[in-house]
Amino acid sequence: MNIRLTASLCLVASAASIASVPAYAQLSSNATVYASGLESPRGLKFGPDGDLYVAEAGTGGTISTVGSCAQVPPPIGSYLGGNTGRISKLDKSGNRTTVASGFPSTLAAEGDLQGVADIAFLNGTLYAVTAGGGCSHGNASSPNVIARVDTKSGSWKAIANLSQFVQSHPAAYPDLGDFEPDGVFYSLIAHDNRLYTLEPNHGQLFSSSASGDLREELDISRQQGHIVPTSIAVNDGRFYIGNLGLFPITPESSKIMSFNIGACPWPFLFGFGCGDEVQKLRLSGSRYGFTTVVALDFGPDGLLYALELNDAAGFPAPPFGVGKVVRLNRAGDIEDVATGLSVPTGMTFGPDGYLYVSNFGAAPSGQILRISVH
C-alpha cells in the first residue's frame, strides 16, 4: 500500500504512546533546542539580515468544500481549510516574531497539516511556496501559489498559481492513491534567477521566475515512477533530488539523484537537433542507501547532508526519536550526524556553520534545533 507524503507526517498519539518512546528518542548531544512554539514548522532559510526565517503549516481551519470540487479520498481526505499558515522570523537569541500570515492552511482527515511549505530568498526578496491551498484542501479561493513576501509590511502577493499549473501539466505517471488535485508542494530553492519547487506526490519539479513565469523542469515520474521526491539542492550547477519513498518504510531504499543541464547527444538521433531539450535536466548519477529523505543541503565542508524523517521499518507510530541527519562523507559512505529527531521536516545551514532543523514538524508546537556538524 502506498502512503503519500502528507500521511507520513501525521503525528497523532495518545499520552500512553508518548510515554512509551524508547531511549533512542533522546536527541544526540550535538543537538540543542534553538526555538520552540512554532506551528508545524517546515522549510527554513537565513535571510540577508542574518535572521532565520521559518515556514509554518499552521493549524488548518474549518472550511469544507465537499460537493464543490474534486476531493482527496479517505483516509487522507477530506480536508478542512483556513488561513492560519504563516512565516516567522527568529533572531539570534531564538525569539520569534511573525513576518507574514494569512496563508492557506489545511487539516487532513487523518490529522496532518499543510500550509506554507518552504521559503527562499531570490535577489534579497523573500518567496514562499504553499501546500495547503486549493479547493481540494478546503481553500477554494486560495490556490497553492508561489508568493512574494514583503518582510517589512508583512504583506504578500501570489506571483504563480501552482494549483492551476499542476492541473494543466499532469505528470506522465501519476499514482492514483497519492493523487492531489491541487498538489502538495514541499521544497523551494532559488537558483540562477529562478525559484524551484517539488511536488512529491505527482513527482514533478517546477520553476518560476520572479514575475511568475512557470515551467515544468522535470517529470521524475517519467524516469523513476512513483518515488515521492521531496528535497532539492544545487551545488556547482548540478541539481540533487532526494526521495521519501513509499510506505511501509524499507530502510536504505531511498536515494539521492544528481541532474545536469542536458546537452545534445552526439551524433543527433535520426538527424534531429535538440531544440528546447538543451535546457532539460538529465540524470547523471544516483546514490542509494538513504531512508525517507525530506531535505538536502550542502554544508560549509562541501559535503552533502540529508534529513531523514524516519529510519524505522514498517509503519512506526508515533515516529518520535527515529529521525536523523546523515551525510555523505569524502569516502562516499553515509554516516550519522545527529539522531533522535522527531518528525523533522526541513533544514538549512546558518552563516555560523551550524545546521538548523525543523523538529516536531507535524505537531502544533514545533521546534527548531541547532546542530553542530563538527
Predicted features along the sequence, with ranges:
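Beta-rich, blade/repeat-based domains predominating
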Residues: G37-D49, T84, S105-T125, V166-L195, ...
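Generic structural signal for coil-to-beta-strand starts
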Residues: D51, N95, G124-Y127, V145, ...
